[in-house]
């Protein structure tokens, strides 16, 4: 159902998902978002998201849901405590196949930038039989 599957990302009731290597950042003075590659960044040298900044990100994982399984994305609680916020548009219908999840994320801190990098564990997918 998920590729790549990483055994250590499996939790008792969910699967951790990670950031891919592209984000979309809001451009100043326009409604458009600009695709930005973050593949050159790492945990040691991250890309910094400014306070209040909104962006779209995709998961590294690709999902292949059968017709009888739905999924719900939720932010990891540790990331919420860091100051991340998610727009709660994370429902995946049964039969959703061959796609990465797009996440609507925001740095909700007032003063400090938050780091991101490809492979960063950002959230969890809960799978439901329907």
Where do the language-model regions lie?
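DUTPase catalytic domain/fold
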Residues: 1-130
């Amino acid at each position: 159902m998920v590729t790549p599957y990483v055994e250590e990302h499996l939790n008792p009731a969910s699967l951790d998902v990670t950031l891919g290597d592209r984000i979309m950042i809001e451009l100043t003075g326009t409604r458009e978002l600009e695709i930005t590659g973050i593949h050159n960044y790492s945990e040691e040298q991250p890309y910094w998201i400014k306070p209040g900044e909104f962006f779209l990100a995709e998961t590294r994982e690709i999902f292949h849901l059968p017709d009888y399984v739905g999924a719900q994305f939720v932010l990891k609680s540790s990331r919420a405590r860091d100051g991340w916020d998610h727009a709660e548009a994370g429902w995946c219908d049964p039969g959703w196949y061959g796609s990465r999840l797009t996440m609507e994320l925001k740095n909700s801190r007032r003063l400090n930038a938050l780091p991101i990098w490809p492979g960063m564990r950002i959230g969890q997918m809960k799978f439901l039989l329907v």
